[in-house]
Amino acid sequence: CRLLTEEGYRAQLTKVGQDPLRKDADVEALWAKVHKSRRSIGSLMMDQHLYAGVGNIYRAETLFRHGLSPFLPGRDVSRETFDATWTDLVDLMEYGVQHGRIDTVRPEHSPEAMGREPRKDDHGGEVYVYRRAGLPCYVCGTPVAERVMEGRNLFWCPTCQPAP
């Protein structure tokens, strides 16, 4: 921990990526970096110099909700899909802050709608793929897959999120 001057603080802020919870996030700057990158979208979303504060759960869940393979290169993500995932991140993360839990499951896949038991996990929310490796996908029934990416466990559905 160190004390920063105002200039030092501003200099550090320039190293931080775009935060979906900030109204002043520069989505155009983020798009420019994602659109040029050969790195996978799953990797890019864990890069705090690009996506500030997104983290592992929101990465896995947002990619699932949009049918995006975490292995798709950033440059192959369309602008329409990029905008849709950004908007979804904003909505999901704002909901998480307001409710103190991470819920990413759409109403039609809720425990009540599907007649299933609620998820029991330490983060306390309903999710599609996060920490569900080997369990059937709520949408298609394929077992959820898991692998390490960017030093974190990545979860995805191989059917709903087909490889590029």
Q: Where are the regions a protein language model picked out?
A:
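Phosphate/anion-contacting hairpin/loop surfaces
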Residues: C1-L68, P73-D76, E80, T85
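A broadly conserved sequence feature marking short terminus-proximal activation segments
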Residues: L72-R131
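Residues immediately within or flanking Cys/His clusters that coordinate Zn2+
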Residues: G134, L154
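Short cysteine-rich clusters marking metal-coordination/redox-active sites
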Residues: C137-C140, C157-C160
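Short functional micro-motifs and their immediate structural scaffolds
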Residues: V144-A145
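Short metal-binding segments enriched for Cys and/or His
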Residues: A163-P164
